[in-house]
């Protein structure tokens, strides 16, 4: 099938991952409780090996007891949760397969299971992520409170990361590696990359570094092409965007806003290309970015490319023309800032934490934190439990046949509210199953 004739994942899907099919035409799995495991749990739904669409009949925070891996061929529709939505807490969540669509979920790890001794690997968990997977689109998710990176995804192919809020990794927490004299200060945003990855309208806030780090040709990856456009980076500390050994990158129309924690030496930094023993510097097309407080850099983005090496290295690193990608709608950095703070993250029902982060960005306040809730290092976990926002359950719609589509919507569209099989049929559209049409209709604004 010609690429241009394929069906996009959902209205508003953009970039290299936009043709991901997820669970289209598969079975319905309903998350009906907040249990760690068992019938009706989130874990049961995401670990099935069949094509499926996951919907929610519950709202609140799911406190995981062990790490969780999401198997492929799945669509997870967080926007279906009644009330204030869903948060996954306490353990890391990872992608364990290809062809995955995830929308409107929150991943807020915290340090409950990160606390331990100074042993290599302790405190090494991301809030959410996945490596070497293909056909992935992560849309309107909120991630925070990691011990390694908040959200890392690299080494795969055909990936889109859009409208995600990445904030408040735990800096002086319990991350320890061999040779350290103390737990590291490791409040990092994420490692991003892949053969073809698009990242747009994401917000990084209060991350010390890796906003993101481009993986480059390392850690099992041979080549990398990333379109990093129309994102917002706020209050980085000692590095903003960096890395990218041996890869190709468009860095265009992003908005950089230094904050209270930003080191004066990197306030005007757009990107810091690096090299290693195996690969030299990548190639970067840098244009259209706004750096607040650095008028000259905004006018000439190349002044914001900070790198070591020779003058010839710099000439080789800076590309005169953008690399060929699946183009995004044209939007300048100023427009990006306004749209992103309005709609980024799990914004269908934005929780109080995301509201605070957005207010931090607008008012240029906030700081790097060490413990969820902003408590000092070493605070007993039980004293931090109120850091997780309360997510209320409300307005559960009647669904007689338990197919994920409420009776009222089925009757409105001429479907059978007592036939569970019609959710996976393509009665109303040749492109999307009946259930997909319903879950997409919930977020009528594709940028919601």
Language model segments and positions:
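Acidic Gly/Asp/Thr-rich repetitive segments characteristic of extracellular carbohydrate-active
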Residues: 8-54
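Right-handed parallel beta-helix
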Residues: 73, 78, 98-109, 132-145, ...
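Acidic glycine-/aspartate-rich tracts in secreted/extracellular proteins
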Residues: 35-36, 59-61, 80-83, 259-262, ...
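Bacterial Sec-dependent N-terminal signal peptides
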Residues: 1-6
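Extracellular beta-strand-rich solenoid/capping regions of secreted or surface-exposed proteins
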Residues: 43-50, 61-77, 84-103, 109-133, ...
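Proline-centered structural pivot motif
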Residues: 391-397, 408-448
